[in-house]
UniProtKB/Swiss-Prot annotation:
Keywords: ATP-binding, Cell inner membrane, Cell membrane, Membrane, Nucleotide-binding, Phosphonate transport, Translocase, Transport. Belongs to the ABC transporter superfamily. Phosphonates importer (TC 3.A.1.9.1) family. Part of the ABC transporter complex PhnCDE involved in phosphonates import. Responsible for energy coupling to the transport system. The keyword NADP does not apply. GO terms for cellular component: plasma membrane. This is Phosphonates import ATP-binding protein PhnC 1. Its EC number is 7.3.2.2. InterPro entries: AAA+_ATPase, ABC_transporter-like_ATP-bd, ABC_transporter-like_CS, ABC_transpr_PhnC, MetN_ABC_transporter-like, P-loop_NTPase. It comes from the Bacteria. ATP binds at residues 35-42.
Length: 279
């Protein structure tokens, strides 16, 4: 599905952000990316979607070599990659529905996107996604009126509206409280399982990574120093990733509460007001 081989990234300053990184991720696999600040986690994610050009190595999404693409070919490849950001990256003045539909911009023509006129099928899908993430009652609310957890759910729905094969998720809980963080992580893992989506989750919270992510990749100074199950994150392994620390307890025995009701299935027909198709 996603194959990264011997990936390097050296910035113009001479700093080597990634050194010989190799990862193979299958369909439906969700991988947690952990490591100290400056380890190269965000750089790796940005190399995959080509926001940052790698210096060397290979990144293949299916049969497509991403490192050689440019222009229209790169734009088409990016349709297959959904992004979920730490700071949500919503358009504040637009409604929840309009933000989710922005995930379809790569599939509609210029004028349709300019006037935000989306096909009815896209509107139906957006309604179903918002129901799935627990926001069916917030459709017409502006993004700047939402809580942090609600904003991240909009970001998740927008990424899924692209119908991606791969999700790149950069610090999805950094701006959230502990309870909301657990709810968001559970939602992400459930959605990936339902759709057999591959995902890379850059996450700073080791406890959350252990709770929700079956496979963990540890980066230190741009190199992979651990790639294995979450259960293998022993104190010695964590020390090799982060340095000396008291790792006697990295996760709490907590009850995970999922506030996102499992509502409309994407395949279920929805009755729409015709005016909604002209959003």
């Amino acid at each position: 599905m996603l194959r990264i081989d011997n990936l390097d990234k050296r910035y113009k300053t001479g700093d080597l952000a990634l050194k010989g990184v190799s990862l193979h991720i299958g369909a439906g696999d969700i991988v947690g990316l952990i490591g100290p600040s400056g380890a190269g986690k965000s750089t790796l994610i940005r190399c995959v979607n080509r926001l940052v050009p790698p210096t060397g190595g290979s990144i293949r999404l299916g049969d497509t070599e991403l490192t050689r693409l440019g222009g229209a070919d790169l734009r088409r490849a990016r349709r297959r990659i959904g992004m979920i950001f730490q700071e949500f990256a919503l358009i504040e003045r637009l409604t929840v529905m309009e933000n989710v539909l922005s995930g379809r911009l790569g599939y509609v023509g210029f004028w349709a996107s300019w006037f935000r006129r989306f096909p009815q099928a896209d509107v139906q899908r957006a309604f179903a996604l918002l129901a799935r993430v627990g926001l069916s009652d917030q459709v017409d609310k502006r993004a700047d009126a939402l809580s942090g957890g609600q904003r991240q759910r909009v970001g998740i729905a927008r990424a899924l509206a692209q119908d991606p094969e791969l999700l790149l998720i950069d610090e999805p809980t950094a701006s959230l409280d502990p309870k909301t963080s657990r709810q968001v992580m559970r939602l992400i893992t459930e959605l990936c399982a339902e759709r057999r989506l591959a995902a890379i989750v850059n996450i700073h919270d080791v406890a959350l990574a252990q709770m929700f992510l079956p496979r963990i990749v540890g980066l230190r100074a741009g190199e992979v120093v651990y790639d294995g199950p979450a259960s293998g994150l022993t104190p010695d392994v964590l020390t090799s990733i982060y340095g000396e620390e008291d790792w006697s307890k990295t996760s709490d025995d907590v009850e995970i509460v999922d506030a996102a009701p499992r509502a409309a299935d994407l395949s279920a027909p929805l009755k729409l007001d015709p005016a909604l198709a002209r959003l």
